[in-house]
């Protein structure tokens, strides 16, 4: 099915290619990640008024006080989750579906993606968008992301797209042995972090300084 904002569909492939080239120059090296981002039309995940800026390396506002992360952040977090291809990503949990762009990228690198969003109307719009794009290996859930999705079993990768001061134990318990979690951590100062589940326990590594909206508890229905 063809889905596009009027006036930019013919240039979207060219601008995606340029975006991928820029990401490569900025240090994103995983060709699987770059191919996924080159395939997913980012302009379909932003508001129509901002569609002309969709391929700029900036975060853009979406509805309900949320943002779509910059392409570099999406590439960086996805590359970290894949860990150079050493992490077999059969099943991923994403906490914070938002507009669904990161979700769609994850769906290109994993067999199954489970994604949780606390804002009901935002999730409804995202569900329609992903269905129109024919992305069928995503399971969306309207719920409080702080508890994860224990009923779905263990995950090879977990990604959180909002900042949190500390990871709850309940989320660590959902990370499979050998799995990796990628998330922003902090308060006023925020850092991109990874947690690897190893035979010696959970090992945390602090990486880049970043800026994300905070994770919030509970759900919103309207």
Swiss-Prot record:
Reactions this protein catalyses: [protein]-L-isoaspartate + S-adenosyl-L-methionine = [protein]-L-isoaspartate alpha-methyl ester + S-adenosyl-L-homocysteine
Xref: CDD domains: AdoMet_MTases
Annotated family: Belongs to the methyltransferase superfamily. L-isoaspartyl/D-aspartyl protein methyltransferase family.
Entry function: Catalyzes the methyl esterification of L-isoaspartyl residues in peptides and proteins that result from spontaneous decomposition of normal L-aspartyl and L-asparaginyl residues. It plays a role in the repair and/or degradation of damaged proteins.
EC number: 2.1.1.77
GO molecular function: protein-L-isoaspartate (D-aspartate) O-methyltransferase activity
Cell compartment(s), UniProt: Cytoplasm
The protein's name in its UniProt record: Protein-L-isoaspartate O-methyltransferase
One record GO biological process: protein repair
Residues annotated as the enzyme's active site: 69
GO cellular component, one term: cytoplasm
Principal location listed in the UniProt entry: cytoplasm
């Amino acid at each position: 099915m063809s889905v596009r904002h009027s006036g930019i569909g013919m240039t979207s492939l060219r601008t995606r290619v340029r975006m991928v080239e820029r990401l490569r120059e900025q240090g994103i090296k995983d060709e699987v990640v770059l191919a996924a981002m080159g395939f997913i039309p980012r302009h379909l995940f932003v508001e129509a008024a901002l569609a002309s800026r969709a391929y700029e390396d900036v975060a853009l506002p979406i509805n309900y006080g949320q943002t779509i992360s910059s392409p570099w952040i999406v590439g960086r977090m996805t590359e970290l989750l894949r860990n150079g291809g050493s992490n077999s990503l059969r099943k991923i949990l994403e906490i914070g579906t938002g507009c669904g762009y990161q979700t769609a990228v994850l769906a290109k690198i994993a067999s199954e993606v489970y994604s949780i969003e606390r804002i009901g109307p935002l999730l409804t719009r995202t569900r329609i968008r992903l269905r129109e794009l024919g992305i069928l290996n995503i399971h969306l859930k309207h719920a409080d992301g702080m508890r994860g999705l224990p009923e779905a079993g263990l995950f090879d990768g977990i990604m959180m797209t909002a900042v949190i001061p500390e990871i709850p134990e309940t989320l660590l318990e959902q990370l499979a042995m050998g799995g990796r979690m990628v998330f922003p951590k902090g308060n006023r100062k925020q850092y991109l972090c990874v947690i690897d589940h190893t035979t010696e326990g959970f090992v945390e590594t602090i990486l880049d300084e970043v800026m994300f909206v905070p994770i919030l508890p509970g759900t919103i229905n309207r």
